[in-house]
Structures are given as C-alpha cells and as structure tokens.
Amino acid sequence: MKYRLVLIDDSQTALDMMAHVLAEAGFEVRAMSSLRRFVNPVLDWKPHLIVTDLYMPEMNGAELCQWLRRQVTTSRIPIVLCSSAPDEELAAVARSVGADAYLSKLAGLDALPERLNTLCDEILW
C-alpha cells in the first residue's frame, strides 16, 4: 500500500529534503510550510498520516495536534510530532497532546522512510 502523508514544517529546506526522501521511498507526499492552506488539503486528500514539526511560528505542532483531535473529520488521523528537541521533551509533549508517535530529526533522513512505514503499519493496521 502506498501511504499518503502530509508533512508540515516551517523550514522549507527540511521540508523539501523530507518530502524528497519519502517520495523516493514510495510515499505519496503533500508538503506544507504554512498552516494557512492546511485544512482543505487534509479534508480532501484524506492522508493516512500527518507528520508535523513541533516548533513553528503560526501554530506549533502540539497546538495543531490538539486542534485536529477536536475536529470530527480529522480526529482519527494519526499524527506524528517531529523535532530536534531532546527525546524526553518530545515524548512528553506527544503524550500530552494526543499524538500517536514522535520522531527525532536527529536520527537523520536515511532512517525516516523505514520509521514512518513501520509507524503506518502499526498505527493503521
């Protein structure tokens, strides 16, 4: 199965690199550097997973996760928080806002497709 992912990160460089690596690995990817155009693509495209950076200027990933959990149409979409913050901090935030998982950016891009594939398999099936 080809998983559909929405990537959200305010760093265009990080976003482009993640999107490229994941697309090369067979994921369908929609990448967004701003939350302004976020809602309609999510509702229309029905992604299997949302991967969002934790620290962003408009609305951080934790706030986005909480907002998505309150919406009927998005409350069941798995959400992964992604950050270069220490694992303990990232894990605590993910638990507190109802994220399904967290990923450290420090692990590098090479491991990203396998980790997200495993998460999709575990969360969705």
Task: Mark where each language-model region is.
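Two-component/phosphorelay signaling modules centered on CheY-like receiver
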Residues: 12-30
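Conserved Asp/Asn-Gly motif in the active-site loop of CheY-like receiver
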Residues: 32-36, 109
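Active-site beta3 strand of CheY-like receiver
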Residues: 45-51
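Receiver (REC) domain active-site loop signature in two-component systems and cognate sites
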Residues: 56
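C-terminal output helix
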Residues: 89, 107-117
